[in-house]
Amino acid sequence: MAFVDQAQIEVKAGKGGDGIVSFRHEKFVAMGGPFGGDGGHGGSIIFKVDEGLRTLMDFRYNRHFKAQPGGNGGTKGMTGASADNRVVKVPQGTTVSDADTGEVLADMLENGQELVVAKGGRGGRGNIHFATPANPAPELSENGEPGQIRNLKLELKVLADVGLVGFPSAGKSTLLSVVSNAKPKVAAYHFTTLSPNIGMVRLDDDRDFVMADLPGLIEGASQGIGLGFQFLRHVERTKVILHLVDMSGIEGTDPYTQYRKILDELQQYDETILNRPQIVVPTKMDMPDSEENLAKFRKEVATDSGLPIQPEIVPISSITRDGVKDLMRLTADMLATAPAPESYRPETKNDTSEKSYTFKPETHDFTVEWIADEERWLLSGAEIEKLFLMTNIQRDATIMRFARQLRHMGVDDKLREAGAKDGDDVRINNSDFVFEFSE
């Protein structure tokens, strides 16, 4: 199965049910008054973490998620049925962002964690809510509020305890297949691994951890070259890094040069990655020149003052299994004390860190535009369009209420400033109205 780690989808919450206009008609109840009920709430779209999922494959074939609308209100003040929320399961480790603004909405880390990504519209109010001493029998009601619509970007970063990094053909897939139940593709050519493979490693002392074989890295990856960012985003979440370096030299490559290039790419992408526990793993020690190359490599590491830390070096041969058990034990020891990556620690309920909030005063953003070829004004804006959709245009009373709401928002003044005259056509959301300015 391919590892799909990015997807873009659309979510559409359910519209609220419409409120209705109704009056109480009962024997012996004089002037019963308004009795129209409210609409039910529309269903929301909720993401929920399911630790059993491993990829975003499902979102490749289903990119549109829609919740049901709420039921309309009834007579006798009865409220319409609220729609069920639609729960969409996502893998553990999914980052959810708004595709239009780039805002990160949440990092879905904990099994069972939920996030409302599109809120269902509230039900419209029935005429029972609009009675006043001046108007005891109102013919006013609201349509349901539109459900929220969002374009979302999903990005899955591997949640593994240990990440295997290194140049292509360094032996990452072979090591994973030896120490775990994973069956990655292994072949004698570069970039055999194009997507992460994950395996569970279990030691003789019952310690276990999750290991990920990440796609091979090349120079320039921090600028997106090769598999670039697709590789590096997964490294961010690993607690311990095993840096595999090919000691065979069969392709004329210098092990230490390759090692430094990988470090440079990690540092350019995110320098904090280099502060994590790391083991350098010289591989293919069963090859003829490997011992000589290892001795030279150790000397170069020891004399390099530019290294962030002097790493542990554990040579292995995945073919003969030499050194593999020692490597896994040392890895488990490091994991026991390794902290979670700082940027991905889930916030705890007892978090007492100071938070700041910004007050945003209410604004009425809308635009007025003259469409010359149609000889009409175009009035647009999210708030205006929402108010219009919640207006029952079949009833004069609700249209008059909508006109008052627009006047309160400053629409009349804005139209007059733009040059609108009495009798001009004004279009709102594909419906036309006649402009009449009121002082």
UniProtKB/Swiss-Prot annotation:
Disordered, as annotated region: 338-357
One GO biological process this protein is involved in is: ribosome biogenesis
Extract the InterPro entries matched here. G_OBG, GTP-bd, GTP-bd_Obg/CgtA, GTP-bd_prot_GTP1/OBG_C_sf, GTP1-OBG_CS, GTP1_OBG_dom, GTP1_OBG_dom_sf, OBG_GTPase
The domain of life is Bacteria
Positions in coiled-coil regions: none
Occurrences of domain OBG-type G (ranges):
160-336
Q: Which Gene Ontology cellular component terms are annotated?
A: cytoplasm
Gene3D superfamilies given for it? Answer: GTP-binding protein OBG, C-terminal domain, GTP1/OBG domain, P-loop containing nucleotide triphosphate hydrolases
Basic and acidic residues: bias regions: 344-354
Q: Report residues binding GTP.
A: 166-173, 191-195, 213-216, 283-286, 317-319
What is its subcellular localisation?
Answer: Cytoplasm
Pfam families on file? DUF1967, GTP1_OBG, MMR_HSR1
- Provide the alphabetized UniProt keywords: Cytoplasm, GTP-binding, Hydrolase, Magnesium, Metal-binding, Nucleotide-binding
- Classify the main location: cytoplasm
- EC number(s) given by UniProt: 3.6.5.-
Looking at the record, the residues that make up the Obg domain are 1-159
Entry function: An essential GTPase which binds GTP, GDP and possibly (p)ppGpp with moderate affinity, with high nucleotide exchange rates and a fairly low GTP hydrolysis rate. Plays a role in control of the cell cycle, stress response, ribosome biogenesis and in those bacteria that undergo differentiation, in morphogenesis control.
Q: Which PANTHER family does the entry link to? A: DEVELOPMENTALLY REGULATED GTP-BINDING PROTEIN-RELATED (PTHR11702), MITOCHONDRIAL RIBOSOME-ASSOCIATED GTPASE 2 (PTHR11702:SF31)
What family does the database annotate?
Belongs to the TRAFAC class OBG-HflX-like GTPase superfamily. OBG GTPase family.
- HAMAP family with a match to the protein in the record: GTPase_Obg
| Stated name of the protein | GTPase Obg
Q: State the gene name recorded for this protein.
A: obg
